[in-house]
């Protein structure tokens, strides 16, 4: 008289809201010394003057919904670091938009004349995406 008992899975899933994960990433790397360590690890450099970092993170209040995680200039490179917990094949497009906004801000802050006859020197762009989602990511 044995009834088939279905085994129940007692696996619990903890979901953290995306905005909190983004906020954590931003909070951790908002400290210049920690960000410099990450930059050095990614670029195989050994810079130690965190004051060389100039933050250029887009604020969504200014740019109507556009927000990036961490962006900064160091030694002639405009770095954009994005944290993603879900796959998004449109990250290159978003990166292009973010860089456009950042260059616009850089040009204004440095009073550069994009209509002049002199070729402007702008920071070189570097885009890094940190992905820690559960879906497999193809190379």
Name what the model sees in each region.
Residues 2-139:
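Accessory alpha/beta interaction modules
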